Amino acid sequence: SIKELAEAGGEIAEYTHKHPLGFLPASLLTVLLYKVVPMSVKQVQEEIDDIVADTLNILNRIYKGKYESDKRYLKELTEMAMLLAHSNISDADAIRQLGEGWTAEETWAIALFCAIRHIDSVENAIIASVNHDGDSDSTGSVCGNIMGAIYGYEHIKERNIFCPEGKKLEETLELSEIILALADDLSTGCIISEYDPIDTPEKRQWYERYCKMRPAGIHSISLPKNNQ
């Protein structure tokens, strides 16, 4: 359920970010990605403000009676990001108003601002999200998550976004096959258990990847002989 997803997103972030303003933005991001993935690009472009507003409402319901001041501040910052995205203020000036991205709530707000303002262009959204003096790798990463969820891998791959001239995405992105395999496995869900036999090729591959830490089925990676 969406409640379980949102709670899981927050709980995972809480392992390293104990303050509510550290893990609540992760919960928001989880809900937002969940909502936009099944939607068409056109629908997201037309309804992004409503989607974000609904995401805030869902967060409030899930953490009802908890972290009230933190939720209120996060809501205000999120709404400010949305307002700035539709304003005439330059990207740089708007980002400065939202912070520098050194805290989770600022990272969320900056990434969201860039995604909404440049909802029609993955390239422009990412460029805006990393062109500031703050924690630009974090804001770029979160913005990339949002834009990737909206547009999908195939769109990015076909356009060879940010690739050197004459190079394809899979040739430019480091460890691209491992990243794609991990994404596919995450979307599939775990297919092995300590109580069940490893009796199919698919289960064997999972066992090799996540119990033995070997890149089984990923042909571009070869391990040193003493690690095989």
Pin down the residues of each PLM region.
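A short mid-domain helix/strand-loop element embedded in enzyme catalytic domains
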Residues: 1-2
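Extended accessory regions or peripheral subdomains of proteins
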Residues: 5-64
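Catalytic phosphate/nucleotide-handling subdomain of diverse soluble enzymes
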Residues: 9-13, 17, 23-35, 106-200
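A cyclin-like helical interaction fold
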Residues: 38-118, 180-227
